Amino acid sequence: MRDLKYLFAYSIPLSTFFSIYFQGIWAYSSVFYAFVIIPLLEFWLKQSSTVYSDQEKEDRIKKKLFDLMLYLNVPIVFGLLGYGLVTLHQDALWTYEQIGILSSLGILLATNGINVAHELGHRSSRFERTLSKLLY
């Protein structure tokens, strides 16, 4: 149950989807979420003081769920990037909407793109390193 907090990593892609789908002022939902909501949550919520033993750390590393969560970021990032670019190309958007969608895509690429690529780049398997290179 403690591991459910890691699903929070998908909140930026979700807000990016809202930015693209709803457009208008909602095009800035990722910007608002990343620079207002998340800092406020960090301010109000207590930081975990849990110290994991070496065995617990080793068990967490071996869990395939965390690997799958990392791998799932690749199609999510590319899917949202494609969806955003198609929307920018096909829809008649106001300039402020274009800026909002592009800003949201930039936040997505900076968080779920580069961070996941960096993490996968530390892995030893060829598959994981290839995923890392795709995201870079």
Where do the language-model regions lie?
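Non-catalytic, topology-defining segments of multipass membrane proteins
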Residues: 1-109, 116, 120, 133-135
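Active-site-flanking alpha-helical
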Residues: 121, 125-126
